Design a protein with these regions (language model features):
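N-terminal strand-loop-strand
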Residues: 164-208, 212-213
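N-terminal alpha-helical interaction blocks
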Residues: 1-125
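Acidic, metal-coordinating catalytic segment for phosphate/diphosphate chemistry
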Residues: 132, 136-182
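Conserved small/polar residues in nucleotide/adenosyl-binding loops
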Residues: 231-238
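Surface-exposed, charge/polar-rich loops and edge strands
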Residues: 217-218
Length: 239
C-alpha cells in the first residue's frame, strides 16, 4: 500500500493528545489481530461506503467507537470505554485510535471477527486499507517495546511524542522505519518486465525486485545489490 493511493484524502501523522469521539475509528487489537465485524452483525449500519470491505469478505468493515460499543454489548459508559485509547493519526477530519483487549479489561472478542494484518492488503476503500496497515505497524511497535531492551523494565508511553520510555534507565524507543527500494527492470525491446516470487512467506504473488537498504548503504547501492541478487533467478513476464 503506497501513501499516494489514498488521494484525494489527506493523512496527518503528527502526534496529538486527543480524546476520541463516538464517530472516530477504533482499531481494537487482540495481540497482533484486529477486530473487524461484518455489516450483517449490525443492522443499523447504513454507510457501507465508509465501512470498507475485503474481496473475499465484502461485508467486513472498520468500525467506529460507537459501533464497537454496541456490537460487543459493552456495559460501561462510552466515556469510560474511551479510556486507555491511543490516538494514532487522522485522515481528513476522521481520527483513528488504538485500543487492546488488555486495555479493555480482558475483553473477549469473537474469534471469527479477528483478522491478521494481511487482511488489509485487499481492503477497500484504499485509504482505510492504508489506515489499517499503518495502525498494525504502530500496534506491533507497542507490543515489541513493552519492556526496555536495555534493562528489561516495563516501559510507559510518552505523553509528548510517539515513543516508549523506560522510567528506570531513561531509554527512549521510537517506531523504526526501514528504508527500502523497489526497482522496475524493463526489457523495452521485448516489452517485458522482470518479476520475482518469494520462495517463502505468505505473499505468493509476483512482485518487482525489492529489498531493504543496509546500514551505511545508498539507495542506488541497494538497488544495484538487489538487481545482482535477483536477475539470474527471476522470470521475465509480459506486461
Amino acid at each position: 500500500m503506497m501513501i499516494h493511493k489514498i488521494e484525494p484524502h489527506k493523512y496527518y501523522p503528527e502526534f496529538r493528545n486527543q480524546e476520541p469521539k463516538p464517530s472516530d475509528y477504533l482499531l481494537l487489537f487482540d495481540g497482533e489481530k484486529v477486530y473487524l465485524p461484518s455489516h450483517t452483525e449490525n443492522s443499523d449500519v447504513t454507510d457501507t461506503s465508509a465501512g470498507a470491505g475485503i474481496s473475499e469478505h465484502p461485508q467486513v468493515y472498520l468500525p467506529t467507537f460507537e459501533e464497537v460499543h454496541g456490537l460487543l454489548g459493552i456495559r460501561q459508559p462510552m466515556e469510560r470505554f474511551f479510556l486507555d485509547c491511543e490516538y494514532l493519526f487522522s485522515i481528513d477530519d476522521r481520527a483513528f485510535f488504538r485500543k487492546t483487549t488488555e486495555d479493555a479489561g480482558a475483553l473477549m472478542l469473537p474469534e471469527e471477527d479477528l483478522y491478521a494484518s494481511g487482511v488489509f492488503r485487499n481492503f477497500e476503500p484504499e485509504y482505510l486499507a492504508f489506515a489499517g496497515i499503518t495502525a498494525t505497524q504502530i500496534n506491533r511497535f507497542r507490543l515489541d517495546r513493552k519492556f526496555c531492551g536495555r534493562c528489561g523494565h516495563p516501559t510507559i508511553h510518552s505523553t509528548t511524542e510517539r515513543a516508549c520510555i523506560c522510567p528506570e534507565c531513561g531509554q527512549i524507543e521510537y517506531p523504526k522505519i526501514s528504508p527500502a527500494v523497489i526497482i522496475a527492470i524493463v526489457d523495452t525491446e521485448q516489452d517485458k518486465i522482470l518479476l520475482t516470487r518469494y520462495a517463502g512467506g505468505s505473499y505468493r504473488h509476483w512482485a518487482l525486485v525489492a529489498g531493504f537498504v543496509e546500514v551505511g548503504e545508498t539507495f542506488k547501492g541497494a538497488a544495484r545489490r538487489e538487481i545482482r541478487s535477483e536477475e539470474h533467478t527471476s522470470e521475465l513476464q509480459s506486461r
